């Protein structure tokens, strides 16, 4: 993994699908990257985990969401939002915009309604 992963438009992109990892490899990369990010000023992370070829939800997506649900990383993560919930009118989208009013400036169209991503807001975030 490169020392400084991709960051575009105020959002750090963590691609967990790259090189078709196993679930364990993806979780390890997720853990390692979050540890690295805790040492930076990065505030928002777009986690690309895919949504599974069957359309039901991939194993990496499910594993990452389980990690976030149980908040095993509460020392780093403030909140997270499923890509499929990032749509105007959805409660999660409204909550995200209320807590982070400038987030609209960095969300891209490919993120809105995308079940293959999860948006993570780091605990120290003041966007």
State what each model feature region is:
Residues 1-127:
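Long, charged, low-complexity intrinsically disordered regions
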